[in-house]
Amino acid sequence: MDWATFWSAASAIATTAAAFVAVWAIFRWKKQDELKAKMAFKLAIADYKYLILQLPDQFDKEELRNKYSNERKKLTDLLSACNHAWLVTEDLLLSHDLIVSNWSNILDTHAHYLQGSRQSEELVIFCNAILSKKFIFS
């Protein structure tokens, strides 16, 4: 038996196995990053909803808008965080029509709520629709 041939074959087999493990790891890594992006969006929506629940139902009076000016700014910052998380998903959620439509509704309603022409309940409904959908592990 030629030991050089034997060790060459063993090395080739080990290299092939290592290549398969590397490809598998890269695939899993990509899936893990997708999961993190979806989770970040859902958590951002949860934070946004949490603040909405602490605010008045409607900012229909100037005194309310003034009293809650810091919270209104924070709500806009949280919407920005939601938008950032949405962008990071890089179209992973576009196949979920319910998510897309409710996210669009949040974007459309946010400014109207802060100006006093819409109620917080609308935003809560849109947030709940997103939060109740199981899309992270799908």
Labelled PLM ranges:
Residues M1-W29:
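Membrane-embedded hydrophobic alpha-helical segments
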Residues K31-S138:
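Amphipathic alpha-helical "stem/stalk" segments
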